[in-house]
Amino acid sequence: FEADRIPAIREMICSDNVEQREKALSKLEPMQQGDFEAMYEALEGRPMTIRFLDPPLHEFVPTEEEDIQLMAKDMGKSVEDIKAIIAGLHEFNPMMGHRGCRLSVTFPEIARMQTRAVIKAALAVQARHPEWTMVPEIMIPLVGELKEFAYVKNIVTSVADELIKEAGSDMKYKVGNMIEIPRAAMCADDIAPHSDFFSFGSNDLTQLVFGFSRDDAGKFLEAYYEKKIYEQDPFARLDQHGVGRLIANACRWGRSTNPNVHLGICGEH
């Protein structure tokens, strides 16, 4: 999110109820729609996958006293109220915390807003360029359980189908999920029949398979290289024996129940 989006995100975070959150999200929706339209235009009809909101909400709130005071003024709340909200967002392990699709489960209005932005952008670009075939691809991050994915996908499809019908369009779209959690990889055969595509998130999958944090592993990995326990940085080169084997098995299991599931990978490897 660019800097001009942050106030609306903070307004959403500070909301006391669904109505207030939806009001804040209504400010974000046209911004996101505009961004998506620009990206669709740049790609000239080529496929584009849009990942739904993934970072934990604490990343959008200030940490410095001066910034906290400014946020309190902007939000019409006391400094103490803002500090209480920020404290409530604190997590001991944010990477494994309230982020990804978990945000859409607890705040389904976020998924509804992002779906509207994606579909309305695609419809607008399709209308301007009838020679292009727009097929929006929506990716749900941090899925670890089929019912979790099904819950969020149902939000997406209900909103998307209504918008497409209202537009009198026959536009198709896809809904898939990231596989970053080992459990999702192990349950790929359960998830695949309900998913149009898998995208293996190699960064988080590596962290969770190895059981160490990318931010902290530098404290001991050099010793592992010196002692030939690891030959290279597992965050720079994908581990073939462990992480790679899990990905290969997940591909096989997923294709066993949905031969047409599209397979991809994203990350820094």
What do the PLM-derived regions correspond to, one by one?
Residues 1-269:
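Conserved alpha/beta-domain cores
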